[in-house]
Amino acid sequence: KAKGERLQAKGRNTRLHLRNVFLMAVSWFFYYKTSGLFLLLLLFVTLSDWLIARRIYEAKSRESKLAKWWLALSVIIDLGLLCYFKYAYFFTNVVNDLLGTEFAVFDLFAYIGNGFSESGRFMVDSIILPVGISFYLFQVMSYTIDVYRGHVQPVKNILDFGFYVSFFPQLVAGPIVRANEFIPQLYRPFRLSRRLFGLAIFWVLNGLIKKIVLSDYLAVNLIDRVFENPLLFSGFENLFALFAYSLQVYADFSGYTDIAIGIAMLMGFY
């Protein structure tokens, strides 16, 4: 009987692992179709933070001060990548204006994609921002910080960690998922009751209403018209359009978040 229970548990764990690997492969393919070569950046971040988190845990278990240095390395790598892709133009322009230099941002990914040729050396205003970079970088940072604080143990299997980082419903537009909330669900059997199915459909429809009915309607029928020709409208109408723009941004992100929550629930994650 005990042997049968062990075999049953082993089979269940194998099915869970295969499910996670399949969803991770789908997520990577999804990101490749939206971002192309920037999939390499996602894979690099996944590998580096998985390795660093394990070093942090080992150092903490020995009460070594190296844990802080490993955490600092993780933060430097993640924030360095974020600053490079999001703020390289800004800082380069500031330096050029102050010092009269002619520095340009070197686009490594364009260089690789162009076959290691000089055509990959883009000017300052040519570098492309990877899709969802802010979300997955802050997510892996929250993971290493949680490991350092002892809120979660490091993931042993890199494929499971890769799934946590790249899960496609929240990869592009969030929400950012905390490791101590999501990772335990990787090893939980799939369960979707009638109530959870109905709740998931509600979240998806709620997000679609926010996005299509509210956000897109405001953008097309009010905000774009006023912003394109502000002098044709009164001061009150311009002010109203500014408030409507804030509502549009909220409805966009909130709608995407609701849709991501609903899709994740349909797959057994909530």
Residue ranges and their predicted role:
Residues 1, 9-270:
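Membrane-embedded transmembrane alpha-helical bundles that form the catalytic cores
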